[in-house]
Amino acid sequence: MSRKQLALFEPTLVVQALKEAVKKLNPQAQWRNPVMFIVWIGSLLTTCISIAMASGAMPGNALFSVAISGWLWVTVLFANFAEALAEGRSKAQANSLKGVKKTAFARKLREPKYGAAADKVPADQLRKGDIVLVEAGDIIPCDGEVIEGGASVDESAITGESAPVIRESGGDFASVTGGTRILSDWLVIECSVNPGETFLDRMIAMVEGAQRRKTPNEIALTILLIALTIVFLLATATLWPFSAWGGNAVSVTVLVALLVCLIPTTIGGLLSAIGVAGMSRMLGANVVATSGRAVEAAGDVDVLLLDKTGTITLGNRQASEFIPAQGVDEKTLADAAQLASLADETPEGRSIVILAKQRFNLRERDVQSLHATFVPFTAQSRMSGINIDNRMIRKGSVDAIRRHVEANGGHFPADVDQKVDQVARQGATPLVVVEGSRVLGVIALKDIVKGGIKERFAQLRKMGIKTVMITGDNRLTAAAIAAEAGVDDFLAEATPEAKLALIRQYQAEGRLVAMTGDGTNDAPALAQADVAVAMNSGTQAAKEAGNMVDLDSNPTKLIEVVHIGKQMLMTRGSLTTFSIANDVAKYFAIIPAAFAVTYPQLNALNIMRLHSPDSAILSAVIFNALIIVFLIPLALKGVSYKPLTASAMLRRNLWIYGLGGLLVPFIGIKVIDLLLTVCGLV
């Protein structure tokens, strides 16, 4: 579920952004953006010249100088406004989260158990390791792990999802978030963070941009822009002696205007806004990124590790067939399978009970009346079952049942091996049922591949992204599902160690890897991956290891995360192309105007036939300022993103933003020149 989206130019945000834009005129704020700092210095310089001309201390056209100075200040203000508006939208999202934080008291237990004596303490004084009790109606005071109890929790303040979730001790659903509310029952929680370090605190800080640092690509682009600025600065500085030698020195005001129009002010003014907006769009998708670096890395990802269950398949495997071993009746197999599944509360276990009922009218037995011992599934045994009336029935993976049979002195039938292979080749998961040391047969669990997922993987392949399915299934089953889903590769019988090794292997090849995870066993791989999206429903260890948290706990969101990252990189690249292409048109406007008196031959470059030198220079400066405002919506929303190959994407952007960057200034400057002339302002 996504949060309510703010209007692009929300009136209250615009007013606040205008105030912030004025505040950002101070040198300390301007110094952070070298390109706009040059414009700021130029504004100061031309302002001083305008004052000197107006007072008669310097010769020259004071009105023209004032106009140039004014529009240079407007250019700086517009750049500040773009950044302030992006930050304001993020802060508005953060303010909605701050409402979740409430000053409250917590019941700190003296001993780590329910019913122990408790002290009432302010929630903001809880430290890591403290034990607290929360009951129905209470706000959970800190991030932590449930060590006792189970409860229904309302997490809508964090996730935006109204449906309550169950949090209980043990397993992957023991993690709770401060600021959420208990709806029923009680929990004993061990705090896992100190004050100011909660997930909500970090979420607010990241959204507000308080910890936003420039990403590597942003730094590289900034260095390029600085280099271009220095080149144009040196080139402009040489023009004064060049024109003076020709007998008619160009004024400092004109040289400043020329410099400002030639340096890449458009992307320089919007660069910070693009980065802030990228993180804001990520939050709009209910994903919290810990840094801009994480969002940027998402755009560069070329390998996606995707969990099969819930991402590629619907995740609700259902029993579809009983396949008896040679000499075993199918009803006998179904009866044993149902008995072994009576205490199995997983969807797979329930489906086995239902299939036996549908096929052979085997009614569910009363669990209590059986006086049986149920054997739960464990990661070590990889099987479950029941001990009843001297019968030892187990169901589990092929390898686990094989070991069980051999340990009990039995022999695993060759025909069952063939049936297991047959089931696996069909893309189903085989479960083997055994009674004592006698193998009864195989249950086929069929998982359904999500509709449209194959087409999405084809789009990712076009973009040069490799998809790898991660599953605990055996190789045959994994291969069948991988072929049906259209993934490029798969990792079968995956363990935490195997996932970690696979990520390192891809990274050693120079690739960037993205993955999702929710369990403590996923933490090492999440920490190693370049883009690691932890599920909000997962453990605290997983959330700390990842660099993003999906509040919806939807593994499929990883594909959307990559799209948002690529859109941010495309936006930055497109606007950089547009900004640099702009310079060509502004060159044709200002150079002839500035030097036409000294070198009349340069009039040949006045292809726009602008009215006069003053109107040409002023029109270029005005266009240079206004284009920033017109591009703010594009910087905040991002350019239109389509899954294309890198070469096709480059061609598309060059046509739209390269050619557009050349043509738009010619049209814009000419229109402004006509308006200035018609209004008699030049």
Swiss-Prot record:
Regions that span the bilayer: 34-54, 62-82, 219-239, 254-274, 588-608, 616-636, 656-676
Gene3D superfamilies: Calcium-transporting ATPase, cytoplasmic domain N (3.40.1110.10), Calcium-transporting ATPase, cytoplasmic transduction domain A (2.70.150.10), HAD superfamily/HAD-like (3.40.50.1000)
Enzyme class of the recorded protein, top EC level: translocase
Documented EC number(s): 7.2.2.6
Cellular localization per UniProt: Cell inner membrane
Binding positions for Mg(2+) per the UniProt entry: 518, 522
GO MF term list: ATP binding; ATP hydrolysis activity; magnesium ion binding; P-type potassium transmembrane transporter activity
Residue positions binding ATP: 344, 348, 377-384, 395
SUPFAM superfamilies tied to this protein: Calcium ATPase, transduction domain A (SSF81653), Calcium ATPase, transmembrane domain M (SSF81665), HAD-like (SSF56784), Metal cation-transporting ATPase, ATP-binding domain N (SSF81660)
Domain of life: Bacteria
Catalytic site: 307
Subunit structure: The system is composed of three essential subunits: KdpA, KdpB and KdpC.
Annotated family: Belongs to the cation transport ATPase (P-type) (TC 3.A.3) family. Type IA subfamily.
Protein name per UniProt: Potassium-transporting ATPase ATP-binding subunit
Source species: Escherichia coli O157:H7
UniProt gene name: kdpB
